[in-house]
Amino acid sequence: METKGYLHQIHPVLPVKQVIDALDFYVNRLGFKIGFADDSKKPRYAGVLRDGIEIHLQWHDAKEWELALDRPMLRIVTQNIEALYEEFSEKDVFHNHTLLRETAWGTKEFAFFDPFKNGLTFYRNA
C-alpha cells in the first residue's frame, strides 16, 4: 500500500503595497513576530508568526492595486476570543463596524481589515 500524503499546515500569502509597512502593522499592532524576510531593509516577501499561525506578506506592484479585485479573507481560530478582542481594541485596528458577535453558524467572532484591505476574522466555536 502506498503511503498517503499528510497536510500539516497552511501559510496564506497576503498581497501588500509595502512589506515593511505590513510588518509594522502585524508586529506592532497584532503582536506577531517576524519569522523571515528576504531583505532586512526593503523586503518584498516576509513571514510573520504568532502562536501557531504563520502568514506570509508579498509585495505587489502599485498598478495591481488600481484593479478592482477582492482581497483575501482569512479566518483564524482562537480559544480566548474575548481576550483577543480586548487586546486588538486597545491597538486601534478596528473599523467602525467591528463587533464581537455570535453568529447563526455557531461561532463567536470579530473581523477587520489590515491596511491593505486583507480581511482578518478571528473566531471560536460558540
Across the structure, where does each feature detected by a protein language model lie?
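A generic structural signal for short beta-strands and their flanking turns/coil linkers
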Residues: H8-I10, N28-L30, R44, I53, ...
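Vicinal oxygen chelate
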Residues: K17-I20, L74-G119
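Conserved short beta-strand elements that form part of the metal-binding/catalytic scaffold
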Residues: I34-L69, G119-R124
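N-terminal beta-strand motif that seeds the catalytic metal site of vicinal oxygen chelate
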Residues: M1-L23, P72-L74, N125-A126
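Conserved catalytic-core motifs of GNAT/GCN5-like acyltransferases
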Residues: V13, K33-D39, L99
